[in-house]
Amino acid sequence: MNMAEIAQLGVSNPYKQQYENYIGGAWVPPAGGEYFESTTPITGKPFTRVPRSGQQDVDAALDAAHAAKAAWARTSTTERANILNRIADRIEANLKLLAVAESIDNGKPVRETTAADLPLAVDHFRYFAGCIRAQEGGISEIDADTIAYHFHEPLGVVGQIIPWNFPLLMATWKLAPALAAGNCVVLKPAEQTPASILVLMEVIGDLLPPGVVNVINGFGLEAGKPLASSPRISKVAFTGETTTGRLIMQYASQNLIPVTLELGGKSPNIFFEDVLAADDAFFDKALEGFAMFALNQGEVCTCPSRALIQESIYDRFMERALKRVAAIRQGHPLDTGTMIGAQASAEQLEKILSYIDLGRKEGAQCLTGGERNVLDGDLAGGYYVKPTVFAGHNKMRIFQEEIFGPVVSVTTFKDEEEALAIANDTLYGLGAGVWTRDGARAFRMGRGIQAGRVWTNCYHAYPAHAAFGGYKQSGIGRENHRMMLDHYQQTKNLLVSYSPNALGFF
């Protein structure tokens, strides 16, 4: 990376030349002595080296977690909450450094990491600090002499496998509730974006007892599979594509442990004709909602990658929507004016370009974009794709398969019934958007769409206290909200008799 570009943001280079695994509160070289280069999508060039871990490293991390789990589970909820709040404070104090680290690792614009990813991470830690302080058990009076007590107890040691699209935020989504609930964690980041979590551990590691959080890097089959299939974890949480999620579920089933899976999506974004009833702030907001397919370079599981426009307004709406897309500024991710950055990897770049080619072969009309964006200078080797809009129909593969890039496929509908049918004609059910000035219609559509989250007159908001998760092949379980504590705890029932008298059966 160009150090001058980083310095302009008021921070030094967040990365060292080489990292180790973070195990038991210390930096530990991989047992096999192997490393791999991590490449920044900004230029397509390596910027650091991280461990290529294997079974021995997974075992070492599990050893450290098990050594810490009893003491951490006994730590009072007050102290755990205080630690989570201190983590939030430390992240906030180093927000710019971590935002730059995330942009270098993932390729997303620094304006997003600064304004969204890292502030959300801060808020999630604070939210779960509050949740665990407020959590209560239960008492049931069976009769005058018999009481049932219900306690929330941690699962113990949990495995977490993090995706490459939001490396720090998705790690936070899993770490915050797991730690609040009293669990120890072994976490494996995606091999495409392995480095920003290591910078985070440099920043917050001293706030946690050794072994409570352990980070091992490596590839899926070499490190992820041994972790997910280990009989020494009590749960596995995974965010990623649906095909890998099936494998994670199979691994977990061998040990009969619970899973949380947040998987793929093909989210509909539905615009009813009344959005054009006036050319006002609401319509402007709806146009932004259409353009949200390009947020994070389209690398979002809930990317609104299917746009459904009521046919009575299609031409007028699309004229304005395409102008909005054309105004999206693509450029250097460390430029604070950049609105869309680079795809996370060369592999993902090629996948997106192959789907763009497929769309044309299927007969879809490319309305804008539709190609790689080759930028100047050092950025020429980066992984950039122009925001792309296709027009077609819902049976096309570009409407049915997850592309995970800045590509939206647009079609029309006649009425509410057809809109709902098209929206639900998918294997997935993670997110959806509904845009209308009619509150009753918004409610009907929200209840009728088969998705875990339906944004209504908004899109891509991810507050800590709103449950997130999928229907159908988009996953199992929920993330965020206080209900997430239930995913990382088990219930202990003490059924106590205070009567001195025998039951009288024997």
From Swiss-Prot:
InterPro entries: Ald_DH/histidinol_DH, Ald_DH_C, Ald_DH_CS_CYS, Ald_DH_CS_GLU, Ald_DH_N, Aldehyde_DH_dom. Keywords: Acetoin catabolism, NAD, Oxidoreductase. GO terms for biological process: acetoin catabolic process; ethanol catabolic process. Its EC number is 1.2.1.3. It catalyses: an aldehyde + NAD(+) + H2O = a carboxylate + NADH + 2 H(+). One of its GO terms (molecular function) is aldehyde dehydrogenase (NAD+) activity. The keyword NAD applies. Signal peptide: none annotated. NAD(+) binds at residues 240-245. The keyword Acetylation does not apply. The active site is at residues 262, 301. Pathway: Alcohol metabolism; ethanol degradation; acetate from ethanol: step 2/2; Ketone degradation; acetoin degradation. It comes from the Bacteria. Belongs to the aldehyde dehydrogenase family. Involved in the catabolism of acetoin and ethanol. This is Acetaldehyde dehydrogenase 2.
